[in-house]
Amino acid sequence: MENKSQKKVSDLKLITLWIIVIFGYLLFVVEWFVIDRISGKPTGILTQSTTTLPQYSGWLSSFFTENAGQIATSSTNWTITLLRAVGSILCGVVVLKFGYRYAVLIMMGIMCVCFPFLIIGDPLNGHNQLTLLRPLSDSVKTQLSSLSSNLQVGQLLGPVMINGKTMLADGTSVELIKGLDGNSIGTAASITGYALFIIFRSTIAIGGTTLVVYTQPAIANLSSNRKKSILSNANLWGFNIGIAVVFTPFLFEQVQQVASQYWVYIMTVMILVVFANLCLFLWFESKIDHIFPQKQTKENMSLTTQPKSIDILKNKTTWKLIGVYGIVLILIVNPLTPAWFSILQTVSPSGSNGLISTGVYTTGLATLAIFWVIGYALGFVVFSPFNKTIYDKKRWMHFLLTANIVVLLIIIMFAATLGIGSAAGFALISIFSFIGGAFAWSLSSSNLILPYEFKDYKKNELPILFGFCWGFGYIAYTLFDITQSVFLQAPVLIQGKGTSILPGVIVSIVFFLGLIALANLIVKFFPACWIKDGDQLVQEMTRKWKLNEWQFVIANKQKNRYSELLK
């Protein structure tokens, strides 16, 4: 009987399939970061002396009256990244259980079932009992004396405090829950609503994260190592383009305000686009022969050797890859977080740690994030061609890891001397964020190409292996996020409000750079890389790269003086 999985699929069809799946991953990245950018602000609490009516926009105003604090805010990320880890680890099991086609459909479907968070986070004209916004009653209006002339009965308002008594705008008495830093952050109902909001929002991450893993079967079945290297490097563009698409519009204050006001409509459109991409995958994948891995059945298990997750986990090389991948994930994601921007602000001199605003554009995390991710454009041209060479990869990995440490130290130095709030300081930090991004993202692409070159793994094992790398990598990132948030919040928790978090910032910086140094040590114990033809070993890569050898940047398939460097 013919084994259907062994039929050759054309590279054109594989590349088209890869485009559809990586587009699904890009949609996840866009959705994920847009939700953060349109979060808005907490409602605050209106009192009889309030003179300015707040603008309620974004989903934060549905659940919180005040900021919940560093640890509480980060705990949301911990929960979500852990769920992403679980999804990534299970994606290998899912693909073996249901086959490649249905595994991708399941994960795209999970992304679509996030839609209840739209209902949970929308006040529904004041009828959503899980939010803080309520229609203003006449009795409450009369007591808000400083605002009464600007108010209308029935308009949505957040909680109010009158004569020491807290109530919703419709007059319902409530008790506010206090956060770790002593702020009153919301009601029991609104915190419950927030928990449900996060649960359904997490399905975007669980499904979307796995899609980048599911690009690997298409890449693994390509006809040449050169094409595999190109698409493996291009995989990172799904994340980087998504970040750039999200952050660029939000550089402008008016876009931020409008998007926060209409966040429900924006997210609805995005979910519909994900569903359309699911339908496109369903149609296109049905036109081609199934690729590895297939659903496990008695028939195909008797014809081929199916990979086993436990065997992959028993391999020591797997854990070395997981260790380095987890640290690289921390390296590429941490500079995109508010915690990193807070670190740069804290080390900046007093008076030079604020934001620069022109009235239209405001400096901040969004600008640095864009420079960080588009740095991969430089890395893609200058550094990524190394992945197509016959050089041993260890020295190259050491070079990139060391370069990242140096660039991050330079960024911190400029923040500490010139300040992130000065034009010169912010400009230099932006430039070196671009350079650092080039090193960091190129490091990530080099790390992702290694499993294709290690003799320990066959191509039908790669989806499971990458699932473990992503899954345990997110666990590592979660542990880092927890540790860093504790470091940053510890001075305030120990000594109270108003305490400088500088000691925690210094510890966080040392911890961050120390992890990168640890990855440098782990790389030393990586096995040798091989040129492979499918699963067949052709030749070990023994040629050692030297720091002054950069001919690979211009080497190509044509017969030129550097063509021998290529696989």
Swiss-Prot record:
GO cellular component: plasma membrane
Residue ranges crossing the lipid bilayer per the database entry: 15-35, 78-98, 104-124, 193-213, 230-250, 264-284, 321-341, 363-383, 405-425, 426-446, 462-482, 503-523
Source species of the chain: Mycoplasma genitalium (strain ATCC 33530 / DSM 19775 / NCTC 10195 / G37)
Effect of a null allele: Not essential, it can be deleted.
Family named by the database record: Belongs to the major facilitator superfamily.
Subcellular location: Cell membrane
Alphabetical keyword list: Cell membrane, Membrane, Transmembrane, Transmembrane helix, Transport
Pfam families to which the protein is assigned, alphabetical: MFS_Mycoplasma
Organism placement in taxonomy: Bacteria, Bacillati, Mycoplasmatota, Mycoplasmoidales, Mycoplasmoidaceae
Domain of life: Bacteria
Name assigned to this protein: Major facilitator superfamily transporter MG061
Membrane topology, as annotated: Multi-pass membrane protein
InterPro entries: MFS_Mycoplasma, MFS_trans_sf
